[in-house]
């Protein structure tokens, strides 16, 4: 590797190297060094980049306009500002990184404790945990816009005010949503627009999900939800979107739903029979069913599974004008379902 000492990097200067190099110097933000596979304090901008080789480490790197960090080893405490890009390849790992407005993080390896404070993160078949999404930032699991990666996984995701998370393919396990939005798309089949790892890219939600005040989760039809427990607090909204299903009947299948003052929306096209299959549905709250069906029958909606609590039902048309709201779910005598009854 190259050897250079006492470098003075002026504002806007570009440095390109790998962790095989031996260099040190200073820039407007402080001092930097690269030695024996360890890099610290670099400022990368204007086309400058650092490649962190397998078995090597980099930390406290700043990525600015057109600066890049390419990681096959490990990295931590990276700050990605506008125009900067962090790429973690399979086998690489990143921790405690901050992605600010205009910054980009592309992950195919592993990441933990990432703060998205205005930037964008795409998980391309990698694994991330304890990611925080807020302040206008966007997190995407399973896509780069051209291909779907069904092997990706995110755990313990937090989506706060102004944050948005999209699950295009892969698994979301455990999430807390407070003031943000999470969208699970319907599973996508291979077509002319997407390349997928298999014939189909599954979308899966598992573990515990909490929707707190002003939080929303929108789930496309066909996503796998049976291993999830979703709790909807006051001010939270869970939307199960079956509007793509044509025909008279729509069946939504979920694991457990706890309504603690929140709302569950069931969106249909023109279905005349709607079934919600759950392991358990309990608590106090409202189910709002949206349909463009011309007639509403007494058996329009039924629930299969354990049902307890005080759950009211409202039926609206496609513009969400109320058709009927004096309804509630009445648990069956056998305790394994519920039907629609006058409130």
Predicted regions and their residues:
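Short amphipathic beta-strand/extended segments with alternating polar/hydrophobic composition
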Residues: 25-27, 38, 77, 115, ...
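A short, compositionally biased
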Residues: 27, 141-143, 212, 261
């Amino acid at each position: 590797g190259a050897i250079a000492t006492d470098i003075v990097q002026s504002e806007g200067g570009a440095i390109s190297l790998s962790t095989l190099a031996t260099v040190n110097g200073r820039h407007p933000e402080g001092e930097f060094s690269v030695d024996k596979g360890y890099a610290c304090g670099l400022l990368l901008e204007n086309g400058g980049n650092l490649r962190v080789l397998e078995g090597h480490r980099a930390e406290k790197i700043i990525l600015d306009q057109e600066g890049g960090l390419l990681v096959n080893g490990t990295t931590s405490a990276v700050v990605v500002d506008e125009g900067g890009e962090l790429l973690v390849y399979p086998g690489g790992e990143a921790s405690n990184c901050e992605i600010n407005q205009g910054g980009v993080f592309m992950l195919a390896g592993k990441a933990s404790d990432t703060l998205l404070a205005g930037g964008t993160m795409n998980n391309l078949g990698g694994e991330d945990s304890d990611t925080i999404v807020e302040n206008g930032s966007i997190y995407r699991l399973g896509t780069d816009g051209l291909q779907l990666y069904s092997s990706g996984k995110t755990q313990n995701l937090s989506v706060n005010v102004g944050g948005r998370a999209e699950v295009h393919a892969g698994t979301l396990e455990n999430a807390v949503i407070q003031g943000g939005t999470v969208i699970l798309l319907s599973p996508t089949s291979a077509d002319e627009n997407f390349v997928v790892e298999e014939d189909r890219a599954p979308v899966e939600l598992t573990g515990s999900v909490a929707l707190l005040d002003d939080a929303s989760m929108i789930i496309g039809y066909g996503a796998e939800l049976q291993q999830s427990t979703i709790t909807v607090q006051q001010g939270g909204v869970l939307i199960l979107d079956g509007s793509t299903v044509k025909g008279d009947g729509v069946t939504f299948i979920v694991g457990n739903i706890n309504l603690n003052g929140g709302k569950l929306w069931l969106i249909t096209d023109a279905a005349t029979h709607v079934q919600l299959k759950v392991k358990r549905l309990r608590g106090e709250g409202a189910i709002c069913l949206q349909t463009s069906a011309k007639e509403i029958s007494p058996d329009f909606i039924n629930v299969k599974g354990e049902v307890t609590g005080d759950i009211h039902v409202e039926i609206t048309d496609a513009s969400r004008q109320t058709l009927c709201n004096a309804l509630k779910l009445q648990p069956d005598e056998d305790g394994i379902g519920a039907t629609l009854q006058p409130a």
